[in-house]
Curated annotation (Swiss-Prot):
UniProt similarity note: Belongs to the IF-1 family.
InterPro entries: NA-bd_OB-fold (IPR012340), RNA-binding_domain_S1_IF1 (IPR006196), S1_domain (IPR003029), TIF_IF1 (IPR004368)
Domain S1-like residues, every copy: 1-72
Organism name: Rhodopseudomonas palustris (strain ATCC BAA-98 / CGA009)
Compartments, as annotated in UniProt: Cytoplasm
Chain spans, region Disordered: 69-92
Protein name: Translation initiation factor IF-1
Assembly and binders: Component of the 30S ribosomal translation pre-initiation complex which assembles on the 30S ribosome in the order IF-2 and IF-3, IF-1 and N-formylmethionyl-tRNA(fMet); mRNA recruitment can occur at any time during PIC assembly.
Chain's role: One of the essential components for the initiation of protein synthesis. Stabilizes the binding of IF-2 and IF-3 on the 30S subunit to which N-formylmethionyl-tRNA(fMet) subsequently binds. Helps modulate mRNA selection, yielding the 30S pre-initiation complex (PIC). Upon addition of the 50S ribosomal subunit IF-1, IF-2 and IF-3 are released leaving the mature 70S translation initiation complex.
Coiled-coil regions, chain positions: none
GO molecular function, one term: translation initiation factor activity
Gene3D superfamilies for this protein: Nucleic acid-binding proteins
Amino acid sequence: MAKEELIQFEGLVTEILPDARYRVQLDTGHEIVAYTAGKMKKNRIKTLAGDRVTVEMSPYDLEKGRLIFRHKDERPGGPPRSGPPRGQFRRR
């Protein structure tokens, strides 16, 4: 199948299912089961419930899809800090 025939939708991951599959609520209101694309697996991009994602679907089977992109969080506080708090140790 040519890439031009694939349809892209945006949605929200509502549930994580076994075997690396996800239940996704599309912006159109439909609910589908999607799996992680190979490039996301290769780059170890983790997807959690509540994440906004882009799903690629075949026009012949509108019940299944492939997660191709996980959108970054739009949190007002910025990304969470990790590691020890600053100022605890002095660099030389």
